[in-house]
Swiss-Prot record:
The keyword Ribosomal protein applies. One of its GO terms (molecular function) is structural constituent of ribosome. The lineage of its organism: Eukaryota, Fungi, Dikarya, Ascomycota, Pezizomycotina. Residues 1-20 are annotated as: Disordered. This is Large ribosomal subunit protein eL36. GO terms for biological process: translation.
Amino acid sequence: MAKEAPAKTGLAVGLNKGHKTTARVVKPRVSRTKGHLSKRTAFVREVVKEVAGLAPYERRVIELLRNSKDKRARKLAKKRLGTFGRAKRKVDELQRVIAESRRAH
């Protein structure tokens, strides 16, 4: 992005010539918010997950994790989700679910 320009001097000559002005505070563009999760969306997803429970493949992944078959669990998640990054995130999330269920009991 452009650097902050030094303040104008109010003179007609020199590097910073021109009228003294106050800088406007510009709101960030809407296009900058793309991909950012809103509070409402996060809340709705949380409620849906709580009501609907886990998908069948998620239950299977949890079963594999409980039997310490981490690599197989990641491969299954990758097959269902498409990319390895998403699969790793999902497996980490499901491991947290297992840990929470252990703490609850």
